[in-house]
Amino acid sequence: MFKKNQKLSKDKGLEVNSVQAGAPEESDVKLNNGGKANERGSNEFLDTAQSKEKVIASVVGNMLHMSTEESEPPQQVSSTSMFSENTIYPKHEGSPKSSTKNTQLKQEDISKTSSYSKQTNSSNIPKSLAITTYPKQGSTLKPAANGTHDREAEKPKSSEDLIQSKKGDIFKPSEDSIQSKKGDMPKSSEDPIQSKKDDTAKSLEDTIQSKNGDMPKSSEDPIQSKKDDTARSLEDSIQSKKGDMPKSSDTIQSKESETPKFLQDTIQSKGGKINKQVKDSMKSKESKIRKPLKDSIQSKENKIPKSSQDSAQPKEGKIHKPLKDSLPSKEGDISKPSEDTIQAKEEITVSPEDTIQAKEEITMSPEDTIQAKEEITVSPEDTIQAKEEITVSPEDTMQSKEEITVSPEDTVQSQEGDIKSSEDVQPSENEIFPFEAEIETLEEGMVRVIKDKEEFEEVLKDAGEKLVAVDFSAPWCGPCRKMRPHFHSLSLKHEDVIFLEVDTEDCEQLVQDCEVFHLPTFQFYKNEEKVGEFSGALVEKLEKSIAELK
């Protein structure tokens, strides 16, 4: 081939400076045979014209034969069409050069090589062209096995065409196909071939339009009916990639279209059943739970105020009755919703396996409501018990307060404006309340509360020579509350001393007569005469005065 290329370059008048060792002899032969080259060129033009007609006729026959015999449309169109365009157009650049070179070859070589290459190319190119005329969607139409088989069948052929075109640049059918696309076909072969070229052009336009999403309009021809079907399926598959729903797809789209419908139907049916069961069960639960909750809460609200009102009363017998009434009602209220929720749970567990998670979420809510109800129902018991404990202590404190606040009617009353406390700081109640139980015993036996002035004078007469200690105090006075426990404790130590307590608010006249101006004030009497007096919350001074004056 290298020698032939040198000969062709010399025939054209091109100068080659570097040639192999055998090149001079061959160049001489070519120069001697210069006259023969012209004759061979003319004969070659005739032979090439005839070979073009034969090749094009064989191409048309094979294309018609291939299009009618194929029962199923070939699959891979887009890739082969693009591949055919890619392989043909590079040839278009080199084809004029190869054609001019081939005209100057020897007649024997041309007849042998062109006939062999044209036969091989006519057997190969119609297949590739027939394949290029059909649309392709390898991923969406037929199974992958057919697609890979077609690819494997096409690649060697196209690669052979490329290799042969690079080696010899002899392929006339490629030149003819290029010329047919450009409209350079000879007039003798233009008539029988024009119809087929129009069909192939239409099919190529259909494949390009199918890629753009346009429907092919070549369904009028009987031969193109299969192409229309494949183009429509290709359009549907391309539209499905863009987001449209495919109308006809064979493998993946049919599965994708069937499975979403099946899944949607199953999910909707299951969702409908689940939603109905869930709604019914939730409604039944809510109706069952709300009723006992309302009943129990109303009963609790009605019963708890009664128990609270009764607890304010000192008798404990009235507290136990509402407790007995409320506890059975609570037990009944708790048992009813628990049975209802258990039945509701049994109804829910009948649902399918797919709704297990929904059941778990649903069944948790009744348990939470039961726990909430139990917490609600338990809390009144605790509150009632706390009320019982609370109501016991107020009885004692109320009794003690009643006994403490009772003042004698005979005591001397004094004006409140004249009474002043000796200390502004008031003691805390925590320091006073621990002595309340002790105060009750002291008030009963040791400390006597004076109610009026007459009673006070009688006590002084009866005492005679005994020491009488009198505490002038008021309930609102903080230092008075602080000194009261100490005053009662000293009454237990000194049995030979009479301890009296005067409420300045009840005995104003007595306060005025005794000239009490500060609270608390302690006065000491013997033989109806005053022997000692001091004011203020002074515990040590009180003890010392009693010990000295006794």
UniProtKB/Swiss-Prot annotation:
Q: What is its main location?
A: cytoplasm
Looking at the record, which segments are called 22 X 15 AA approximate tandem repeat of Q-P-K-X-G-D-I-P-K-S-[PS]-E-[KE]-X-I?
104-440
Q: Which gene encodes it?
A: Txndc2
Q: List the disulfide bonds.
A: 477-480
Bias regions of kind Polar residues — which residues? 73-87, 96-105, 112-140
**Keywords recorded for this protein, A-Z:** Cytoplasm, Developmental protein, Differentiation, Disulfide bond, Phosphoprotein, Redox-active center, Repeat, Spermatogenesis
Q: What does this protein do?
A: Probably plays a regulatory role in sperm development. May participate in regulation of fibrous sheath (FS) assembly by supporting the formation of disulfide bonds during sperm tail morphogenesis. May also be required to rectify incorrect disulfide pairing and generate suitable pairs between the FS constituents. Can reduce disulfide bonds in vitro in the presence of NADP and thioredoxin reductase.
Location of the region described as Disordered in the Swiss-Prot/TrEMBL record: 1-50, 63-428
Q: Where are residues bearing Phosphoserine located in the sequence? A: 42, 51, 158, 351, 379, 407
Tissue specificity as recorded in UniProt: Testis-specific. Strongly expressed in the testicular seminiferous tubules, mostly in the round spermatids.
Protein name as catalogued: Thioredoxin domain-containing protein 2
Supply the source organism for this entry: Rattus norvegicus
Highest taxon of the source? Eukaryota
Do you know which SUPFAM superfamilies this protein is assigned to? Thioredoxin-like (SSF52833)
- Locate the Thioredoxin domain: which residues? 401-550
- Provide the residue intervals of the sequence repeats: 104-118, 119-133, 134-148, 149-163, 164-178, 179-193, 194-208, 209-223, 224-238, 239-252, 253-267, 268-282, 283-297, 298-312, 313-327, 328-342, 343-357, 358-384, 385-399, 400-412, 413-425, 426-440
Question: A Gene Ontology molecular-function term?
Answer: thioredoxin-disulfide reductase (NADPH) activity
User: PROSITE patterns, alphabetically?
Assistant: THIOREDOXIN_2
UniProt subcellular location: Cytoplasm
Q: Where is the composition biased (Basic and acidic residues)?
A: 148-205, 217-259, 277-304, 313-348
Q: Which Gene3D superfamilies match?
A: Glutaredoxin
Q: Does the keyword Transcription regulation apply?
A: no
